[in-house]
């Protein structure tokens, strides 16, 4: 650990500082203000003749990003969470003894606490003239080379802390993410929704069609499943008497990783008694309008080279109409299982003959429609067979009162009128078991306790989930989900695998 020559040199400097009575890792160093506050508060000197105010004695802190020694003085650039600032100090300003120590031991990457006044250099740069410079933290590992930075994408994800040090834009993206979550939370609170927390470990893998992570509870001696979705617990709360609830939290799916999938991801799910899925679509449009406004993005934004128009209302189109309009498929084909199988095979797609019509229509949708839905589009009235928790349409028993929101070829939200008929729900679970036996690994398990909860009576309810990660990708114009997750899942390095062996 820390065994290369540059790291060893820095360790020696840390030891030298200790020998001089200077702790390279001190505590209780308190800064007065951020660098942004310093710039804003003292910008008035730019309008003055002398362009300095020596009556100020402000304390700031930051990481050294640049260091330039010019004879008896040092110019440095420090950076904190928000911005950067040039600092200047010399033998005269900090004293010859301290200056000599700093000149020898300060390095790029170190964190310093600086006290001084604002001034403008001869080259016109707003700066801080330091009277005191204290080492706050000695960095042992050198930062990547300035002009090339940390450009290897794998290293950026594996060492996010270095990525954040070197790339200001990365920090800004995660500030946006934090703001998005905060805005969503306040949006639902202002609508009268109650924020709740439900279990992360489930006795049954349910709430969505996906493959779960399995763990074991030693004390109870039973398997547990990291939650795929919180849906069934949130609906139990509606049964219990709450009428509007939401949860922002992690979900886990033991599936592949790609540009839009990470094994653990963040969602918001919300359930609203005495409302329907049309109300949810209206609410979703309102939420997007709020986010775009608060993030100063306007009604049209760019994502992956495409311009997306968020003007209301969003397009609403039935599942089957989307297959025809965007997929270019004939109406008679999408209603015929054999024709669908022939079409899929002819175009080189996998086609499981055991799947029923609704699942095959979903194969058509995934392969011919989804990527063509660029502007916000609500696809409504899904096949009932792929909607095991949705209410069945009164007008067509093969259709679920369900929608998904697609933007730029990606699903962003899924919502529906909740199935509250316990007998129908029980039969749907049985169908899911049949699907699992036919080879569908993602089919839901039977959850008799949930069916029993419905037996006590759940009021007419609409529920929806929105993927926070994909939403942030959209709002920050990021192509990969790993760009909006602080510490995304990564394949183990060969060295890590060898250690386990």
UniProtKB/Swiss-Prot annotation:
Any one cellular-component term (Gene Ontology): cytosol
InterPro entries for this protein: Aa-tRNA-synt_II, aa-tRNA-synth_II, aa-tRNA-synth_II/BPL/LPL, Lys-tRNA-ligase_II, Lys-tRNA-ligase_II_N, Lys-tRNA-synth_II_C, NA-bd_OB-fold, NA-bd_OB_tRNA
GO molecular function: ATP binding; lysine-tRNA ligase activity; magnesium ion binding; tRNA binding
Catalytic activity: tRNA(Lys) + L-lysine + ATP = L-lysyl-tRNA(Lys) + AMP + diphosphate
Cofactor notes: Binds 3 Mg(2+) ions per subunit.
Cofactor section: Mg(2+)
Chief localisation class: cytoplasm
Subunit note: Homodimer.
Protein name, entry field: Lysine--tRNA ligase
Species the sequence originates in: Campylobacter jejuni subsp. jejuni serotype O:2 (strain ATCC 700819 / NCTC 11168)
UniProt gene name: lysS
């Amino acid at each position: 650990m820390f065994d290369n020559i540059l790291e060893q040199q820095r360790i020696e400097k840390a030891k030298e500082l200790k020998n001089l009575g200077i702790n390279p890792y001190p505590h209780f160093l308190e800064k007065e203000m951020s660098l942004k506050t310093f710039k804003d508060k003292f910008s008035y000197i730019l309008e003055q003749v002398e362009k300095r105010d020596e009556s100020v004695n402000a304390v700031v802190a930051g990481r050294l990003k640049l260091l330039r020694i010019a004879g008896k003085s040092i110019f440095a650039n420090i950076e904190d969470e928000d911005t950067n600032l040039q600092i200047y100090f010399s033998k005269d300003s900090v004293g010859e003894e301290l200056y000599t120590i700093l000149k020898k031991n300060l390095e790029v990457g170190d964190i310093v606490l600086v006290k001084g006044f604002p001034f403008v250099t001869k080259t016109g740069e707003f700066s801080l003239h330091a009277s005191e410079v204290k080492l706050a933290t000695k960095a042992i590992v050198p930062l990547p080379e300035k002009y090339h930075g940390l450009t290897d994408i794998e290293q950026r994800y594996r060492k996010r802390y270095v990525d954040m040090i070197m790339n200001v834009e990365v920090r800004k993206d995660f500030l946006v993410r934090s703001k998005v979550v905060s805005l969503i939370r306040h949006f639902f609170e202002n609508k009268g929704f109650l924020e709740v927390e439900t279990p992360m470990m489930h006795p049954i893998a349910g709430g969505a069609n996906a493959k779960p992570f399995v763990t074991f509870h030693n004390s109870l001696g039973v398997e547990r499943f990291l939650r795929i979705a919180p849906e069934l617990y949130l609906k139990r709360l509606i049964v219990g008497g709450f009428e509007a609830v939401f949860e922002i939290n992690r979900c886990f799916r033991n599936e592949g990783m790609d540009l839009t999938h990470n094994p653990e991801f963040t969602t918001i799910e919300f359930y609203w008694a005495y409302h329907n899925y049309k109300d949810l679509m209206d609410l979703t449009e309102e939420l997007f309008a709020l986010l775009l406004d608060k993030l100063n993005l306007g009604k049209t934004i760019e994502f992956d080279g495409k311009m997306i128009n968020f003007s209301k209302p969003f397009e609403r189109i039935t599942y089957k109409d989307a297959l025809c309009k965007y997929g270019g498929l004939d109406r008679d084909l999408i209603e015929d299982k054999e024709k669908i199988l022939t079409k899929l095979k002819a175009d080189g797609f996998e086609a499981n003959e055991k799947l029923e019509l609704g699942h095959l229509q979903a194969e058509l949708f995934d392969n011919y429609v989804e990527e063509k839905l660029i502007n916000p589009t609500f696809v409504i009235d899904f096949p009932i067979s792929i909607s095991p928790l949705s209410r069945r349409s009164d007008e067509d028993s093969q259709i679920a009162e369900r929608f998904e929101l697609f933007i730029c070829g990606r699903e962003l939200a899924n919502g529906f009128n909740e199935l509250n008929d316990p007998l129908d729900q029980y039969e749907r679970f049985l169908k899911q078991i049949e699907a699992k036996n036919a080879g569908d690994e993602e089919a839901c398990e039977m959850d008799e306790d949930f069916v029993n909860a419905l037996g006590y009576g759940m009021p007419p309810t609409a529920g929806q989930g929105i993927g926070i990660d994909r939403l942030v990708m959209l709002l920050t114009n990021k192509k990969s989900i790993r760009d909006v997750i602080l510490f995304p899942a990564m394949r183990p390095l060969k060295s890590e695998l060898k250690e386990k062996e």
